[in-house]
């Protein structure tokens, strides 16, 4: 596959993730959009790593670290969302003002 096609795919995924993150009112949807952004970054890391120097695995190893960080972020984010849902009975971002009791 050509470099431009993969970069356009990564840009589309990143744009969809940013749009969803900006317009989302639901915390779970915002977490999903954040994961989409991280996956777009991984696609670009692996693509540039293969394009510039295919003998070294720097981009591939960095993308594995990003996947591990994304998994930890998703676990912590879902734990926070479930805790907020237990206390507030809502996962909407604008209804969960944590400063008020």
Swiss-Prot record:
GO biological process, alphabetically ordered: ATP synthesis coupled electron transport; photosynthesis, light reaction
GO molecular function: oxidoreductase activity, acting on NAD(P)H, quinone or similar compound as acceptor; quinone binding
Catalysed reaction equations from the record: a plastoquinone + NADH + (n+1) H(+)(in) = a plastoquinol + NAD(+) + n H(+)(out); a plastoquinone + NADPH + (n+1) H(+)(in) = a plastoquinol + NADP(+) + n H(+)(out)
Gene3D superfamilies the record matches: 1.10.287.3510
Name of the gene this protein is made from: ndhE
Family: Belongs to the complex I subunit 4L family.
InterPro entries: NADH_UbQ_OxRdtase_chain4L/K, NUOK/Mnh_C1-like
Keywords on record: Chloroplast, Membrane, NAD, NADP, Plastid, Plastoquinone, Quinone, Thylakoid, Translocase, Transmembrane, Transmembrane helix, Transport
Binding partners and assembly: NDH is composed of at least 16 different subunits, 5 of which are encoded in the nucleus.
Enzyme Commission number: 7.1.1.-
The protein's role, per its UniProt record: NDH shuttles electrons from NAD(P)H:plastoquinone, via FMN and iron-sulfur (Fe-S) centers, to quinones in the photosynthetic chain and possibly in a chloroplast respiratory chain. The immediate electron acceptor for the enzyme in this species is believed to be plastoquinone. Couples the redox reaction to proton translocation, and thus conserves the redox energy in a proton gradient.
Top-level EC class as recorded in UniProt: translocase
Protein name as catalogued: NAD(P)H-quinone oxidoreductase subunit 4L, chloroplastic
Residues that span the membrane, as ranges: 2-22, 32-52, 61-81
Subcellular localization: Plastid, Chloroplast thylakoid membrane
Membrane topology reported for the UniProt record: Multi-pass membrane protein
Top-level taxonomic group: Eukaryota
GO CC annotation: chloroplast thylakoid membrane; NADH dehydrogenase complex
One Pfam family cited in the UniProt record for this chain: Oxidored_q2
